[in-house]
Amino acid sequence: EVIIAGGAGSAHLPGMLASLTTIAIIGVPLRGDSLDGIDSLYSIVQMPRGVPVAAMGIDSAYNAAIFACQILSLKHPHLKQRLLEHKQILEEEVEAEDSQLNNDKSKQKGNFS
């Protein structure tokens, strides 16, 4: 129902898969030996007309997996609930990190007064 394909350099795999199937393809550009993955990113986002590939950020397989779950959740409702739970966990982690940063800033202000 959805394929995640990674590629470094000219990143042929995502584009080749997209040209051969009607299944949604998510391309993940990977860092290679040169250009720090920018070449891979350009290869994936510059697909010709009629060969769509959803492009993620460089080395962003995690986001590709989340995006694939979002696509699959349209047909498989149980995945939607799992995604909502996952996003709630992420939100709680961000709030905890924000609270920690604010506490650290308060302590630093106290040291310089």
What are the roles of these predicted feature ranges?
Residues 30-34:
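Short, acidic/turn-prone active-site loops that include or flank metal/cofactor-
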Residues 1-29:
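Glycine-rich phosphate-binding loop
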